[in-house]
């Protein structure tokens, strides 16, 4: 395994495979994509969303019956970009296994709970945080009013979807997301954000379908 610098200065490991045709090098993320594993390991913006959506659509077209594993370590980011990923997860045919490693906060936590019910997971020492959407506006009074209405709409939409995915009453979601609400993996399981806390013994196997936890 070697490594190189990508355009934003991050080190991306390279994997070299040997065959009868010679050597072929892949960056580690492309190699894992062949095993139907996607990584969301950055704040969420339009560029990140476009990449994640493209990978989801590619794997859907390649095999509609095999699970896709989405590993999440993200502090959140753009609500609109996150909703693009969310809607794609809901629309594609394969089950999407979501796995939190490190931190899933804000839109990261929202995408974690958006995975296929029974297949939403977290490593034991991860942290999960939900809160209301952030926003700000400046300009003329009418412009600020327009932005305020949009933020309130997004807040109501996200709260309702969180209630749907977790099984919590909407009133509790509204209260808990009023400020940053941090949870351990076990607390997130009890809350309904995830279905199981995993360890080495039950870590999903690459390329294999995961049994739904009821």
Curated annotation (Swiss-Prot):
It is an enzyme of class 3 (hydrolase). GO terms for molecular function: ATP-dependent peptidase activity; ATPase binding; serine-type endopeptidase activity. It catalyses: Hydrolysis of proteins to small peptides in the presence of ATP and magnesium. alpha-casein is the usual test substrate. In the absence of ATP, only oligopeptides shorter than five residues are hydrolyzed (such as succinyl-Leu-Tyr-|-NHMec, and Leu-Tyr-Leu-|-Tyr-Trp, in which cleavage of the -Tyr-|-Leu- and -Tyr-|-Trp bonds also occurs). Its EC number is 3.4.21.92. Its main location: cytoplasm. Keywords: Cytoplasm, Hydrolase, Protease, Serine protease. GO terms for cellular component: cytoplasm; endopeptidase Clp complex. GO terms for biological process: protein quality control for misfolded or incompletely synthesized proteins. It is found in: Cytoplasm. CDD domains: S14_ClpP_2. It comes from the Bacteria. InterPro entries: ClpP, ClpP/crotonase-like_dom_sf, ClpP/TepA, ClpP_His_AS, ClpP_Ser_AS. The active site is at 106 (nucleophile), 131. Fourteen ClpP subunits assemble into 2 heptameric rings which stack back to back to give a disk-like structure with a central cavity, resembling the structure of eukaryotic proteasomes. Cleaves peptides in various proteins in a process that requires ATP hydrolysis. Has a chymotrypsin-like activity. Plays a major role in the degradation of misfolded proteins. Belongs to the peptidase S14 family. This is ATP-dependent Clp protease proteolytic subunit 3. It comes from Trichormus variabilis (strain ATCC 29413 / PCC 7937) (Anabaena variabilis). The lineage of its organism: Bacteria, Bacillati, Cyanobacteriota, Cyanophyceae, Nostocales. The gene is clpP3.
């Amino acid at each position: 395994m070697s490594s190189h610098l990508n355009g934003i200065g991050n080190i991306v490991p390279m994997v070299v495979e040997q065959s009868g045709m010679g050597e072929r090098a892949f960056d580690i993320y492309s190699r894992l994509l062949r095993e139907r594993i996607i990584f969301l390991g950055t704040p969420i913006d339009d560029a990140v969303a476009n990449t994640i959506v493209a990978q989801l659509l590619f794997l859907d077209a390649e095999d509609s019956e095999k699970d896709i594993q989405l590993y999440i370590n993200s502090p959140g980011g753009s609500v609109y970009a996150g909703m693009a990923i969310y809607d794609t997860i809901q629309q594609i045919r394969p089950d999407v296994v979501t796995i939190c490693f490190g931190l899933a906060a804000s839109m990261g936590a929202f995408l974690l709970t958006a995975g296929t019910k029974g297949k939403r997971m977290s490593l034991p020492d991860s942290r999960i945080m939900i809160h209301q959407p952030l926003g700000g506006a400046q300009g003329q009074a009418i412009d600020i009013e327009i932005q305020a209405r949009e933020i309130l709409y997004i807040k109501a939409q996200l709260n309702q979807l969180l209630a749907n995915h977790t099984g919590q009453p909407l009133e509790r979601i509204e209260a808990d997301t009023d400020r940053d609400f941090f949870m351990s993996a076990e607390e997130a399981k009890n809350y309904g954000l995830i279905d199981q806390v995993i360890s080495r013994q039950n870590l999903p196997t690459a390329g294999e379908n995961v049994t739904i936890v009821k």
